[in-house]
């Protein structure tokens, strides 16, 4: 069976379901694909197809994730759903499935539970920009006042983690009824309402090519008579011949000019997001550039050494550490293409971190790295991955 061609006619957005175990994330995912596929085409996925999520590896960490896709009137969505709580933690921290927005599923019968809170906090820490709420199992609650109370609790929880509680769309429904073909307002109509909320509340994300130019340095060569060539994959934006660029990270920031872009040994006028290119730099010496730095549009990214991060520490079974670590732990932090040693400061209430935990930490690197909030990294000891993390807030 040949794979059908991906038609890029509608803008593409990445979303996912989050929320407490057994509140109905997977049932909702099945209901969305079932109802939207009948309206806009696409493939319906049954509950057990989604629940049997295949294993994937991201940054050396095994994660179970189910990927489905569906269309609404205006957009094409890629949607991730994870079977277990640990999979969510790993997924959100490694950025294996980058989300432009999340659908928080909360059971109206139970109200917000510990993982509801934890997933909202994670979404805030890893930079998921928008949350829409699906209040599920509303068919099990007869009391309208109780529904109102649960909705209020959810809005307060969103506010607490700096999401706009009052402005957040909350859709009341029952994923189970919808999946069973119920056409009522808690069934199919609720799914259609959710689709409208996705379309209107989550803005179309900026495409990588529209961002400010950035390319991590992978290798540096000296070509006699021509100068220094830096190779790598353009992460975002466009670089044109003749443009000024900065070299950021490790040492003091330097300014230079791009005098040539080549790809597969051919000269180009420009390189753009996704391209593997060699960039020729004017007047830059071979020893001025090294792996771990980035080339970027001047002023767009700054080098930093001190930041807070949300991290996941691999369990022993995943090939991680066998023992806990303590305050002032000094592993290597692998950003983009290189390792930098840093010291870890634990939160006041944490004496140690066990393999398999996720925790907020503060890090001080020995060398500056070009970074922005939301940048992902791996934590390594002697080349072996022992954790994954994401920059939450830059301190300096």
Curated annotation (Swiss-Prot):
Residues 136-139 are annotated as: G4. PROSITE patterns: G_TR_1, G_TR_2. It comes from the Bacteria. Its EC number is 3.6.5.3. The keyword Lipid biosynthesis does not apply. SUPFAM superfamilies: EF-Tu/eEF-1alpha/eIF2-gamma C-terminal domain, P-loop containing nucleoside triphosphate hydrolases, Translation proteins. GO terms for molecular function: GTP binding; GTPase activity; guanosine tetraphosphate binding; translation elongation factor activity. It is found in: Cytoplasm. Residues 60-64 are annotated as: G2. Residues 19-26 are annotated as: G1. It is an enzyme of class 3 (hydrolase). InterPro entries: EF-Tu_GTP-bd, EF-Tu_GTPase, EFTu-like_2, EFTU_2, G_TR_CS, P-loop_NTPase, Small_GTP-bd, T_Tr_GTP-bd_dom. Mg(2+) binds at residue 26. Disulfide bonds: none annotated. The keyword Hydrolase applies. Its main location: cytoplasm. Gene3D superfamilies: P-loop containing nucleotide triphosphate hydrolases, Translation factors. GTP binds at residues 19-26, 81-85, 136-139. One of its GO terms (cellular component) is cytosol. PANTHER family: ELONGATION FACTOR TU, MITOCHONDRIAL, ELONGATION FACTOR TU-RELATED. HAMAP family: EF_Tu_B. Belongs to the TRAFAC class translation factor GTPase superfamily. Classic translation factor GTPase family. EF-Tu/EF-1A subfamily. GTP hydrolase that promotes the GTP-dependent binding of aminoacyl-tRNA to the A-site of ribosomes during protein biosynthesis. Monomer. This is Elongation factor Tu. It comes from Methylibium petroleiphilum (strain ATCC BAA-1232 / LMG 22953 / PM1). The gene is tuf1.
């Amino acid at each position: 069976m040949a794979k059908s061609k991906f038609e890029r006619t509608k803008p593409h957005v990445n979303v996912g379901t989050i929320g407490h175990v057994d509140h109905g994330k997977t049932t909702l995912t099945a209901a969305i694909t079932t109802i939207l596929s009948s309206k806009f085409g696409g493939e319906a996925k049954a509950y057990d197809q989604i629940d049997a999520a295949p294993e994937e590896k991201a940054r050396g960490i095994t994660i179970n994730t189910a990927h489905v896709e569906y269309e609404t009137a205006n957009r094409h969505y890629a949607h991730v759903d994870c079977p277990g709580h640990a999979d969510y933690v790993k997924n959100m921290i490694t950025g294996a499935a980058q989300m432009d927005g999340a659908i928080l599923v909360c059971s109206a019968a139970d109200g917000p539970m510990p993982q509801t809170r934890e997933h909202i906090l994670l979404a805030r820490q890893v930079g998921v920009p928008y949350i829409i709420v699906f209040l599920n199992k509303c068919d099990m609650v007869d009391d309208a006042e109780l529904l109102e109370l649960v909705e209020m609790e959810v809005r307060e929880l969103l506010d607490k983690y700096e999401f706009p509680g009052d402005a957040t769309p909350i859709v009341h429904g029952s994923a189970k009824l919808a999946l069973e073909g119920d056409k009522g307002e808690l069934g199919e109509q609720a799914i259609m309402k959710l689709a409208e909320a996705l379309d209107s509340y989550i803005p179309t994300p900026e495409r990588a090519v529209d961002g400010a130019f950035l390319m991590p340095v992978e290798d540096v060569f000296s070509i006699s008579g021509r100068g220094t060539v830096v190779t790598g994959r353009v992460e975002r934006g466009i670089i044109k011949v003749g443009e000024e660029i900065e070299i950021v990270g490790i040492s003091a920031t330097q300014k230079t000019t791009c005098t040539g872009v080549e790809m597969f040994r051919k000269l180009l006028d420009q390189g753009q997001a996704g391209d593997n290119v060699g960039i020729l730099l004017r007047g830059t010496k071979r020893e001025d550039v090294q792996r771990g730095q980035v080339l970027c549009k001047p002023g767009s990214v700054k080098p930093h050494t001190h930041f807070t991060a949300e991290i996941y520490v691999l369990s022993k079974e995943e090939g991680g550490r066998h023992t806990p670590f303590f305050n002032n732990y000094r592993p290597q932090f692998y950003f983009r293409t290189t390792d930098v040693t840093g010291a870890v400061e634990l939160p006041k209430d944490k004496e140690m971190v066990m393999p398999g935990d996720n925790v907020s930490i503060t890090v001080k690197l020995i060398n500056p790295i070009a970074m922005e909030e939301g940048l992902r990294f791996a934590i390594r000891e002697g080349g072996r991955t022992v954790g994954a993390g994401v920059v939450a807030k830059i301190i300096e």
